[in-house]
């Protein structure tokens, strides 16, 4: 076989491989797009249900009316009037593994009634323990500035997760300050 025939055969085979790879990639992309389109509403609904459950967990009320937050704290995502019981504040402080999305209940006296972690990407077995009841219970009844013991406060930091503990403490402080700004 001549050198020209070998080169032409090799080029044809390469073109065939490229076209095949492109077709497989296009089919996979199309399938992923279809799955995303089918599940996007379910995912949004599940996230909304999780957020509503977090509101009820930190401060029970018949309704949660959104308020306009005009403060400068960028960790405050939303503030809700929880009927006559007080307020629920969604905050996103920055933890070790990224933002920690959490709800903080605040009564009419400016006291934390509870916290609920909605979403986080903290290290499993360390920072992820911030969602455990024992850690979250420390914040109930706190007002003013909340800090871990290492920073002069009275919140016991999670072992090996001081950054996460500080982030949650800062989130609670931000929520308390946001409610105080409302008057």
PLM regions: where:
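Flexible, solvent-exposed loop/hinge segments and secondary-structure transition points
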Residues: 2-183
């Amino acid at each position: 076989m001549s050198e020209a025939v070998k080169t032409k055969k090799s080029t044809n085979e390469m073109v065939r491989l490229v076209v095949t790879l492109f077709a497989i990639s296009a089919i996979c992309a199309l399938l992923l797009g279809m799955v995303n389109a089918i599940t996007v509403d379910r995912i949004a609904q599940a996230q909304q249900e999780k957020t509503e459950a977090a509101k009820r967990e930190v401060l029970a009320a018949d309704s949660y009316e959104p308020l306009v937050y005009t403060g400068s704290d960028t960790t405050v995502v939303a503030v809700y009037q929880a009927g006559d019981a007080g307020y629920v504040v969604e905050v996103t402080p920055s933890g070790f593994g990224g933002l920690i999305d959490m709800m903080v209940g605040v009564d009419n006296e400016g006291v934390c009634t509870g916290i609920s972690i909605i979403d986080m990407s903290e290290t499993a077995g360390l920072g992820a323990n911030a969602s455990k009841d024992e850690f979250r219970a420390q914040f109930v009844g706190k007002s003013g500035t909340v800090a871990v013991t290492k920073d002069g406060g009275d919140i016991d930091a999670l072992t090996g997760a001081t950054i996460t503990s500080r982030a949650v403490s800062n989130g609670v402080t931000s929520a308390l300050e946001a409610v105080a700004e409302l008057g």
